[in-house]
Amino acid sequence: MMTEISVPLIFTDAAANKVKALISEEENPNLKLRVYITGGGCSGFQYGFTFDEKVNDGDLTIEKSGVHLVIDPMSLQYLIGGTVDYTEGLEGSRFVVNNPNASTTCGCGSSFSI
């Protein structure tokens, strides 16, 4: 019997599939999507996404569909219980974070406050 391990952040199929497509375009299977939090934006904190080849000590790695999402420990504390997704809409296509810890978010959804 397999046991379900609680993952502190959900990495959706849509996000994983887009990461897989982008990695394929770059022809570098070592790339991982890193999500991080920085100070700034209109609400105090903002989300960032970048591709990274390395995993640092203390980073959390979530695997889905053969690709990896990496989060540093400082950012993770603000993201616990959230969802990393990929959307296509009027604002264009982008990775987004749905964060239940955010008390307010800006209109574009890229910054938040606790």
Swiss-Prot record:
Entry keyword Iron-sulfur: yes
InterPro entries named in the record: FeS_biogenesis, FeS_cluster_insertion, FeS_cluster_insertion_CS, FeS_cluster_insertion_RrpA, HesB-like_dom_sf
Keywords tagged on the record: Iron, Iron-sulfur, Metal-binding
Needed cofactors: iron-sulfur cluster
Stored Pfam families: Fe-S_biosyn
Membership in a protein family: Belongs to the HesB/IscA family.
Subunit structure of this chain's protein: Homodimer.
Protein name: Iron-sulfur cluster insertion protein ErpA
Species in which this protein is naturally found: Pasteurella multocida (strain Pm70)
Protein encoded by which gene: erpA
